[in-house]
Regions:
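N-terminal "mature head" segments of proteins
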Residues: 36-165, 171
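Terminal alpha-helical anchor/extension segments at protein ends
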Residues: 60, 65-76, 158, 199, ...
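Surface-exposed loop/turn elements that mediate protein-protein interactions on large endomembrane-trafficking
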Residues: 75-98, 120-136, 158-174, 201-219, ...
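Repeated scaffold domains used in trafficking and secretory/extracellular systems
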Residues: 99-109, 137-149, 177-188, 221-230, ...
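Short beta-strand elements that form the blades of beta-propeller/WD-repeat-like
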Residues: 105-118, 122-123, 144-156, 160-162, ...
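Intrinsically disordered, low-complexity linker/loop segments enriched in Gly/Pro
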Residues: 191-192, 202-221, 228-230, 238-240, ...
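Secondary-structure boundary elements
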Residues: 233-236, 262-264
Length: 441
């Protein structure tokens, strides 16, 4: 058949068939080569990918410990850097006062700056050195109370009352009896301790200075004398410490009042709780509301921390005894610092005094013997300051001494001025005729 087919072809057709056969053979060879070499290339690619994954895995295994080690050393470096004792000081700005303005009696922390208080008026200076407001008045001896963005200034043994905010004067009033003490709430409501010959009154004023005709009367021969008092942040609660004589023995009682609708329902006197046995033989010298629910009472011999979470049933949460005479206390919204004599024989060689810090819950953070005798103390930001005349010391909330400073002029007051304390901290130093902002690092 093939022979018949071959003889039927023309000469030119044979050549075409030969070429076609050659092309088929060529294509077969190329296909075989592609299959063989393609498989080899695929095998090579897979091997390379596997080697790449293996190398990446090794790099990850090596790099992760190195990263953790680096972070650990950086954290350790930051920890020791942030806890080191500061040794350098630089001045950021200085605001000077005239001789008349320099006759200041006192400085107080207010909002982010300080208030300079004198017989002729008060000035509010922000932490940037800007004078925000200046309130003129004439008072023989001004008394002040500050709570958040509000402050009250009254004339001791007089009747004038000024209520101010960070923006300036809010209200002004007159008291019917001489003013002894003030306590202002975080909303501007003012409680004023007024006195006459045989009685004392705690009267309430609105932030505009209007007498609200709400008050507490105590007869000194029976109820005793109010040693100190404090209102809560919202102005609805009042804590008062009374001292009284019983069989010729001086005693103390602490009374909680509530001036909201809850207190009104309790009774006409608005008393929701009282504590006497807790302070038997003690003299209560200071009381203060940290918040609307947490407060403390300071007496000779220790501290008591109270809760008014249940508004009609105050509760003593914790009592902390303090050996030695309590010389000074200071506080902010969250902490309470105490400066006392050191009576512990084991610590006598480390200092004659003790510095203690408590949370508002009553938790003791530290109790540290120190040798420096400051005449004033302030807690501000995350620092505690002890100072007198031309020297001051700065402690952190772990009890570490961070800076030991001196000044050329007598130091009236100081406070923290830092928003962020990485690598150092900034302070406002207040002198008779000027205020300085400095950085210690």
């Amino acid at each position: 058949m093939e022979d018949i087919f071959r003889y039927c072809l023309r000469p030119g057709d044979r050549e075409v068939i030969k070429v076609s056969d050659q092309e088929r053979e060529s294509r077969k060879r190329k296909l075989k080569e592609n299959v063989i070499f393609g498989e080899k290339e695929k095998e090579n690619t897979e091997e390379e990918e596997q080697e790449g994954r293996s190398r990446a895995s090794i790099r990850r295994k090596l790099s992760l410990p190195l990263v953790f080690l680096l972070l650990f050393f950086l954290g350790l470096l930051f920890f020791f850097y942030s806890k080191r004792r500061f040794s350098r000081i630089s001045t950021r700005w200085t605001t000077a006062f005239s001789d008349k303005e320099g006759s200041s009696q006192e400085y107080f922390s207010f909002a982010d700056g300080v208030v300079k208080l004198s017989k002729d008026g008060a000035s509010y200076l922000s932490k940037t050195g800007k004078l925000i407001w200046n309130q003129a008045y004439e008072m023989g001896s001004p008394v002040v109370s500050i709570n958040g963005d509000f402050m009250a200034i009254g004339e001791k043994s007089g009747s004038k009352l000024f209520i101010l905010s960070t923006s300036g004067l809010v209200g002004q009033g007159e008291s019917p009896l001489p003013i002894e003490k003030l306590s202002i709430s975080g909303k501007g409501v003012v409680y004023a301790l007024l006195s006459d010959k045989d009685s004392t009154y705690i009267t309430v004023f609105s932030k505009e200075g209007r007498n609200l005709d709400i008050g507490i009367r105590s007869v000194m021969s029976g109820d005793g004398f109010p040693m100190d008092f404090s209102t809560s942040k919202d102005g609805e609660e009042l804590l008062v410490a009374f001292s009284y004589l019983e069989q010729s023995v001086l005693k103390s009682r602490v009374v909680f009042y509530n001036f909201s609708s809850l207190g009104k329902n309790v009774g006409a006197d608005r008393v929701v709780g009282g504590f006497t046995d807790n302070f038997s033989g003690k003299i209560v010298g200071r009381v203060h509301f940290f918040t609307n629910e947490e407060s403390f009472v300071a007496y000779n011999g220790g501290l008591s921390f109270f809760s008014t979470r249940v508004k009609t049933s105050p509760e003593e949460k914790k009592q902390e005894g303090i050996e030695g005479t309590i010389r000074m206390i200071c506080y902010n919204d969250s902490y309470l610092a105490v400066f006392a004599d050191n009576t512990k024989d084991a610590d006598k060689g480390k200092g004659n005094y003790r510095l203690l810090l408590f949370r508002k819950s009553g938790e003791r953070l530290f109790d540290k013997p120190i040798s420096y005798m400051g005449s004033k103390m302030e807690i501000s930001g995350d620092k505690i300051f002890l100072y007198q005349e031309k020297t001051y010391q700065v402690y952190d909330f772990s009890g570490r001494l961070r800076y030991n400073g001196t000044t050329e002029d007598s130091l009236y007051y100081l406070r923290s001025a830092s928003d962020f304390n990485l690598g150092g901290t900034e302070l406002m130093l207040c002198f008779p005729n000027k205020v300085e902002r400095v950085r210690i690092q």
